[in-house]
Amino acid sequence: MKKLTVEKPWGQFKQFTHNELSTVKIISLNSSSSLSLQYHNNRTEFWRIISGHPIVTVGETTTNASPGDEFFIDKLQKHRIETKDEPAQFLEIAHGDFDEEDITRLEDKYGRA
C-alpha cells in the first residue's frame, strides 16, 4: 500500500487507497485486552492509532504507540496490538484477499491459539 499526502491551500489530505480492493475497519480495544499474536497469508494491513496508547508488535519490534502512529504489516508478518490501563482505537485498512478465517494465531490470551 502506498500512502499519498497531498498539500492543499486549506491543509492536506492523506489518501490510503486508490481504486484498490480493500477492507476498512475502526477497531476498538477495551483496556487490559489484546488481539492475538497472529499473521495472515493473504492480506497486508495498515494500522493508524486513533486514540489511546496501545503496545503494538510488528515482526520483532514492539512499540509504545500514540495517536497518529502508523504501522504497515506484510503478509506472513506476525503482529499484535494490546492495551493496559486505557482503551484504544485504531484504523485498519486491509489489502488483498480479506477473509476473517485468514488468521493464524501464535498466542492468544482468550484460548483461541
Show the residue positions of the predicted features.
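Double-stranded beta-helix
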Residues: M1-K8, R80-A113
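A short glycine-rich, His/Asp/Glu-containing loop-to-beta-strand
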Residues: K2-Y39, R43
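Short, conserved beta-strand element in jelly-roll/cupin
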Residues: I27-N30, Y39-V56, I93-G96
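Active-site donor-binding loop signature of nucleotide-sugar glycosyltransferases
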Residues: L29-S31, P67, K75, T83, ...
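Structural motif
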Residues: S34, F46, H53-I55, K78, ...
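Short acidic-glycine-tyrosine-enriched beta hairpin
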Residues: G59-K78
